Amino acid sequence: MQRRGQPLENHVALIHWQSAGIPASKVHNYCNMKKSRLGRSRAVRISQPLLSPRRCPLHLTERGAGLLQPQPQGPVRTPGPPSGSHPAAADN
């Protein structure tokens, strides 16, 4: 009962989607429309590049967060690992 009653604001996935600039209303509507058969076409419109049309961000907290993490972490990781990987490659 409490899980279903949780406000969307506290949902982990919703926080990540909001950080990407997607309003909670779109995420919630996307979740509801995906449940209906006719909602597929509508869900694709709302999906945008960050939202996968076949997966609901509200139901996938870890995966939903993972979709947004690679983008910010990509440029952040590039400066660190290369310095450690180059000497390792030279040793090999």
From Swiss-Prot:
Source taxon at top rank: Eukaryota
Region feature (Disordered): 60-92
Name of protein: Putative Wilms tumor upstream neighbor 1 gene protein
Gene assigned in the entry: WT1-AS
